[in-house]
Swiss-Prot record:
It comes from Rhodopseudomonas palustris (strain TIE-1). Gene3D superfamilies: 3.30.190.20, 3.40.50.790. Disulfide bonds: none annotated. This is Large ribosomal subunit protein uL1. One of its GO terms (molecular function) is rRNA binding. The lineage of its organism: Bacteria, Pseudomonadati, Pseudomonadota, Alphaproteobacteria, Hyphomicrobiales. It comes from the Bacteria. GO terms for biological process: regulation of translation; translation. GO terms for cellular component: cytosolic large ribosomal subunit.
Amino acid sequence: MAIGKRLKKIREGIDRTKLYPLDEAVKLVKERAISKFDETIEVAINLGVDPRHADQMVRGVVMLPNGTGRTVRVGVFARGAKADEAKAAGADVVGAEDLVEQVQAGNINFDRCIATPDMMPLVGRLGKVLGPRGMMPNPKIGTVTMDVAGAVKGAKGGSVEFRVEKAGIIQAGVGKASFDADKLVENIKALADAVNKAKPTGAKGTYIQRVAVSSTMGPGVKVEPGTVH
């Protein structure tokens, strides 16, 4: 099927001007995830904040009740007993100076990054590499911690980091098209709840302004913001 015809087909039945209840939006998106691979279901939340101001930054981490459906590779910067704990918890890559050198050389074999507090002077050198990828460990989201085992298990088990982008948007994957619709709805509501709890003091007016759900290759479906709470 030609790409144009395919896009026309999957867009049929979606009113681009309508705001759908969350459960209906998820159903529409799932029905149109027709690729040969298991597409990721993604959510975009437009917030009434200006992240250029420090008091309007929104970031955090949420444990999705039904996981993400992704295999997440976790890297841990730790030494000694903490390194052993990380390995036992299932970390894919564990190291100290050696791991710093690997990352500096461009070998990033992980999707999420965790560090013990004592490692941060070393890990701080990697800001230019890990920062743009959104992978820099941060105590505010639990990725700089002495509980490396808990952090590794969380990352593997469905925790999702979120951070508002320059345009005031938070985007996150909340599961796979193969998930039951009610499981996706639960995950989306958990994300929205975490975003609400992370509302900064500097936010004025309507906080959650627009919400849309889509699949990797499918069209976006606009959601009634009030139905995600």
